[in-house]
Amino acid sequence: MAKQPLLLMILDGWGIAPAGQYNAAALAKTPNLDALFDKYPHTRLSCSGAAVGLPDGQMGNSEVGHLNIGAGRIVYQELTRITKAIKDGDFFENTILSKAMQTVKANGSALHLLGLVSDGGVHSHISHLFALLEMAKLQGLNKVYVHAFLDGRDVGPQTADVYLAELDAETKRIGVGKIATVAGRYYAMDRDKRWERVQKAYDAMVLHDGTVCTDAVSGVRASYAGGVTDEFVVPFIAAPEADSCVKAGDGMIFFNFRPDRARQMTRAFVDEEFPYFARPQTARPVNFVCMTQYDETIKAPVAFAPETLEDTLGKVLADHKLQQLRIAETEKYAHVTFFFNGGEEEPNVGEDRVLIPSPKVATYDLQPEMSAELVTDKLAELLDTDKYDMIILNFANPDMVGHTGVLNAAVKAMETVDACVGRIVEKVLSLHGTACITADHGNLEKMLDETTGQPYTAHTTNQVPFLVVSDEKHTLHEGILADIAPTLLELLKIKQPAAMTGKSLLTDKNK
């Protein structure tokens, strides 16, 4: 008997907001999604703040969203966990952080704090940097340098001067710390193996290779004057003294808590074998600490070790001997695999993974179609194999193009995805399968910051849609991302495990 596949389609960054001239989702011509909303049951899901284990009012993100969806429960995020440790005082007694600081003190070497300096809360939080500076002061350190990576995506695109001024004021108040180098996240936090970008930030940190500016704030404002916003600020030197260079024996704490954009820079400092660019011997080895576990294969101590999630959706499907497929392009591949599986690198038994390369362009407004059509082509081909019971698919376009702040490109991104959705749904229904369509967080439904008049490049706290497209009749109630996995299990007629505390969104009378 042919399989009737169940598909979960995640349109990354597709939130709900009133129609308006800066809502790319509403401006786009989406005949396929419009028809599905008219015909099939749909509801709204909360995907920010406490609903996904974040502080109240904190926007969700792709990592958090996929963790919650795959776990079928609210997963308390590293942001919440670390912030709570600071509030409780446990942070300042963390053994890994204490050891790193005491080693630096004993060696008479410098401590370098590197990470994203904003309160975006997606990859890092500036309050965690302030806590590290407080801790360094308590530990009696005096040579402490900050290597500031600039955001411009999870916060406004031209706000780094404000964050750097705040950081500078905080170092003066605490009495320790100095901004040594500054780099846009485009360089320092690449995740697509564009090592030439990482090298620019690395060389600034270890060789002082870059423009020397009077101070961090004036350097950033000079970039603004040249039309370069935060994300793309070319690495520069803000404190040219010799000690601010990273040297062998120094301590380093990378305070980003989200792994995907921290891995490459971390590997540049800690990996023994490193073929991507030349590293001076003067900068190795260092005593490197990761705030969270960036990758099991990275050989560096972790300040906040991962908490294990039992009975994720992928594990339950494997336990029931079902065949599952995860498919996405490069930008969201980690999300439908690593994050969806609760931070597990290894696939479940019966879990196949397909990675479609993302296009090699500087920014995705230049190619808003990204690789959506190639993903769709491959999925259509795999659906014909009659192999899979469950498919997890992510379309990256709404999020990645939304982040550029370019409205017409975001509209094109949404129209591209709509065409792909139409093709996939038609195929799934022809196999008498079911397609659930949702998102992990909002983004492209807000493309302008009405307060500043600047393009809005961050995520939103808006709810996201959830549709069930099926030959069977269903009714739904509102919920949260954690309710998706229990819903999928009910559609598969599989009992929900106790570890999953989400609730099925189905309110069918025949339940």
Regions of interest found by a model, annotated:
Residues 1-511:
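Feature captures the catalytic ectodomains and active-site-proximal regions of enzymes
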